[in-house]
From Swiss-Prot:
Signal peptide: none
Record protein name field: Non-motile and phage-resistance protein
Organism encoding this protein: Caulobacter vibrioides (strain ATCC 19089 / CIP 103742 / CB 15)
Role of this protein: Member of the two-component regulatory system involved in the regulation of polar organelle development. PleC functions as a membrane-associated protein kinase that transfers phosphate to the response regulator PleD, leading to its activation.
Organism placement in taxonomy: Bacteria, Pseudomonadati, Pseudomonadota, Alphaproteobacteria, Caulobacterales
Subcellular location as annotated: Cell membrane
Transmembrane segments: 29-50, 283-303, 343-363
Keyword line: ATP-binding, Cell cycle, Cell membrane, Differentiation, Kinase, Membrane, Nucleotide-binding, Phosphoprotein, Transferase, Transmembrane, Transmembrane helix, Two-component regulatory system
E.C. numbers: 2.7.13.3
PROSITE patterns, per database record: HIS_KIN, PAS
């Protein structure tokens, strides 16, 4: 602080004025003793002196001690109200930020009050929204009406005959006016009086809220307790004369509290001087007793001085207790002189701003201790307080270089004294350290945000009601499942009203099949099924979740239909069992017949082929002799041509018979292969050598492209026949000037290494839709070119069968007009354990 003057010697407060009066009392006693000593010889002057003392005593009944006790009650009430208003302000700020946090607001006020409030409620125009603490029959609605009727932002008072003190602050809830109200026992604020004395707390209209002590129990107003009206009490600090219910005279001191909203009352029996009056008056004209009267009067004045000192000590003690009460409530006191820009700070307030204690500082020094972001709002609050009287602002005090920690302070005050042309010149108020409350609010807000995020992230519908059946929170899935408008789901909405709208989306519902308590299943209007679960919370609220079980219901329905279909199928199977048995017998009979017919066919073909080959060999032999003119010229050259045709036709017929014979052996299972180690290059060269003359005669180029290959285990004759068939087909269907190429390569396979052999030609090609028919016996593809060639369609079928017997695969790739590639794979090592591979035609 720029000019820190240390602890203030005195502040402009009512307790200081009373203390000054008490200090001046001893000097008045000595003056009176000196005057009486000078007038002891004159009885008549003695009588007048005694009479003057009596008037002075009557003018200030009760003296400083009684006023101090009234100030003590007022100070205790102010400290109580300051603590409660701090909590109410924090709750009002919380409701402005989050209208749904009504219960958090009530609990925040209850904690901030530090035990000064028994219960806290949030009351809206619709009624009581939330209550925290011990309710004990508090009339919250009446208190809210009284607070609203007062027209003040902060209101204190009492309603009904309950002896409760209510403190309220005005806020907003869903754009409507609402009140946060604290309630407590008013009798706690009135300390236990000493013997014969009494204390009370009253409203400005004279109604007693709380009273303790002699003759005031059960009294409802100041007139009943002290035989005084509000007009009798007056505006000054002096005590007035009253009368107890039993007729005893009382000295009554009154102090306004909370800007006149309450009156603190202290009363004590009047110190009687009636006996002294009688003694003095009776001996006033006696010359024998003036000395005694003077001595008695001196003793009386000394006693009064002693009592004044005692009252002064009591005032010091009461002031100390008041400070302890304020410090215990973490409440600092301050006074701002706006004209002189001087601020008086109590020890607690000075410590809040980073100084070691209280004192008087300049307003600029104080503002420099406030966060730069909040200084303007403090200046604005001071300007408003000067104009309208009320001061209420929250600001942060950063950590100081001396090591003081950063604090949040709520400062509240009121204009003091009669306002002038520029408004109030002084603002008196309290400062509350609300750092812990701010931290708690931030943590609570963070926890609530995490809870809301978690609730929003769950796939189920979720809704939470409080114990009064009011809506606290829900997630988007709840709104979606029950097709509810956002305006229906405002915080605080009645559960019955929300359920009425939610029921419109439900087609039917019934208890869960397993009979679980609080669980039911519902079919929605859109066809979905949900499982609704309800349970009570520890605070008496209700949690409801709704999970989508449409998939489960669909599966159950499908399972039910499947069970019905299965039962029908079983019944049908039982009915057709005899028919199936009869069909099985017929099938077995037909199977035997088919196998016999197929075997007979194969045997017939084998026999016929053998019978045909015998005469055919003679035809081929003699035609070859005639063609080569081994026994001389035949004469006409046409005979030689005829013999060539006979030999060519015979060779073709022999090849056809051989194919039929081999095919029959394969179908009859009589074809035996002899697997032996061999080089595929040797087989290929042998096959190419046999067809090379035909290729050259057809004007074709015949190439072989074989790399270094490993030995394989295969049947030499069968592999050679496969290559001859493929080469013959390629030569047969390739036009002149075309080419035929034989290639081989090694392929890696999980079942063992393979050798792939390909025969590629540049012939007429085959359409894609005809490829699948080619490997079947006696199948040929009709084309303009094929009409000029001979064949039975057994070549590829026989080739495929021989490759399959080698555990190989035949593949065909062809493009019409471009050529055909026929390839097959053979395992390097033959195994008795056959591996099935399908024929691939592409």
């Amino acid at each position: 602080m720029g000019r820190h003057g240390g602890p203030a010697a005195a502040g402009p407060t009512a307790p200081s004025a009373v203390r000054a009066k008490a200090v001046n009392a001893p000097s008045q006693v000595f003056v009176r003793i000196a005057i009486l000593a000078a007038l002891l010889l004159l009885a008549v002057y003695t009588a007048f002196g005694v009479h003057r003392l009596q008037r002075e005593a009557m003018a200030q009944p009760g003296g400083a001690p009684l006023a101090a006790k009234a100030d003590l009650i007022a100070g205790r009430v102010d400290a109580n109200l300051a603590a409660q208003r701090a909590g109410l302000s924090a709750a009002a700020d919380l409701l402005k930020r989050d209208p749904g946090a009504t219960m958090d607001a009530a609990e925040t006020t209850l904690r901030a009050a530090g035990g000064e409030a028994a219960a806290v409620a949030v009351v809206s125009e619709a009624g009581v929204v939330a209550v925290a603490g011990r309710d004990d029959g508090a009339d919250w609605k009446a208190a809210a009406l009284a607070a609203g009727a007062s027209g003040r932002t902060n209101w204190v008072g009492s309603v009904g005959e309950t002896g409760r003190l209510y403190v309220a602050t005005t806020t907003s809830l869903d754009r409507a006016r609402a009140f946060v109200i604290a309630s407590g026992d008013a009798s706690r604020l009135v300390a236990d009086p000493e013997k014969g004395e009494s204390g009370a707390l009253a409203l400005p209209d004279g109604k007693l809220i709380a009273a303790r002590g002699r003759g005031v129990q059960g009294a409802g107003a100041l007139r009943e307790a002290f035989a005084l009206s509000i007009e009798d009490l007056g505006d000054g600090p002096a005590a007035v004369r009253g009368q107890a219910a039993d007729g005893a005279l009382l000295d009554v001191a009154v102090r306004p509290v909370a800007q006149g909203a309450l009156l603190a009352v202290a009363a004590a029996p009047t110190r009687s001087v009636a006996n002294l009056d009688r003694q003095v008056m009776e001996g006033a004209f006696s010359l024998l007793v003036p000395l005694g009267v003077g001595i008695a009067l001196a003793l009386l004045l000394m006693i009064q001085s002693r009592k004044a000192e005692v009252a002064h000590r009591e005032f010091i003690d009461s002031e100390r207790r008041f400070r302890l009460a304020v410090e215990a409530a973490r409440c600092g006191i301050w006074e701002w002189d706006l004209n002189g820009d001087q601020v008086y700070l109590s020890d607690v307030t000075g410590a809040m701003f980073g100084w070691g204690g209280g004192g008087v500082v300049s307003g600029q020094d104080l503002l420099e201790r406030i966060s730069i972001d909040h200084r303007e709002r403090v200046r604005q609050a001071l300007a408003n307080a000067a104009m309208y009287g009320a001061f209420d602002v929250s600001f942060r005090v950063p950590a100081s270089e001396q090591g003081a920690r950063s604090l949040w302070i709520d400062a509240r005050g009121q204009g003091f004294g009669k306002p002038g042309s520029e408004g109030h010149a002084r603002i008196i108020g309290v400062a509350l350290d609300v750092t812990e409350e701010r931290i708690a609010q931030a943590r609570a807000q963070a926890a609530e945000n995490r809870l809301r995020d978690a609730i929003e992230s769950v796939s189920e519908a979720f809704v939470l009601w409080d114990r009064q059946g009011r809506l606290l929170m829900c997630n988007r899935n709840y709104r979606s499942v029950f097709s509810l408008e956002p305006k229906i789901l405002k915080p605080g909405a009645a559960r019955a009203e929300v359920n009425r709208f939610a029921a419109l989306a439900i087609k039917q519902d019934h208890p869960a099949p397993d009979g679980a308590k609080g669980v039911r299943e519902a079919e929605m209007m859109d066809g979905r099924w949900i499982q609704i679960s309800e349970r009570r919370t520890a605070e008496g609220g209700l949690v409801m979740t709704a999970a989508d079980i449409t998939a489960i219901k669909t599966q159950e329905e499908a399972r039910r239909r499947n069970e019905e279909q299965l039962q029908n199928a079983v019944a049908g199977l039982e009915r057709s069992q005899e028919q199936l048995a009869e069909l099985a017998r017929k099938y077995e009979t037909e199977k035997v017949k088919a196998e016999s017919a197929n075997k007979a066919k194969s045997e017939f073909l084998a026999n016929m082929s053998h019978e045909l080959r015998t005469p055919l060999n003679a035809i081929n032999g003699f035609s070859e002799i005639m063609m080569n003119e081994m026994f001389g010229p035949l004469g006409d050259q046409r005979y030689k041509g005829y013999s060539q045709d006979i030999h060519s036709s015979g060779q073709h017929l022999l090849a056809l018979i051989n194919d039929i014979l081999d095919m029959s052996k394969i179908e009859a299972g009589k074809m035996n292969l002899k697997f032996e180690s061999m080089h595929l290059e040797d087989v290929a060269e042998d096959a190419v050598r046999l067809v090379r003359n035909r290729a050259e005669a057809a004007g074709l180029k015949l190439d072989i492209d074989f790399p270094q290959l490993p030995e394989i285990e295969a049947d030499y004759r069968a592999v050679k026949q496969v290559l001859l068939n493929l080469l013959s087909n390629a030569i047969k269907f390739t036009p002149r000037a075309g080419s035929v190429t034989v290639r081989a390569e090694v392929r890696r396979d999980p079942f063992g290494d393979l050798i792939k052999v390909s025969v590629t030609d540049t012939g007429i090609g085959i359409a894609k839709e005809d490829l699948a028919r080619l490997a079947k016996p006696f199948e040929q593809v009709e084309s303009q070119f094929s009409k000029t060639t001979q064949g039975t369609g057994l070549g590829l079928a026989l080739t495929k069968s021989l490759i399959t017997m080698h555990d190989g695969v035949l593949e065909m790739h062809s493009t019409p007009g471009e050529g055909t590639t026929v390839s097959f794979t053979l395992p390097v090592r033959h195994s008795d354990q056959k591996i099935t591979r399908d024929f691939v035609a592409a």
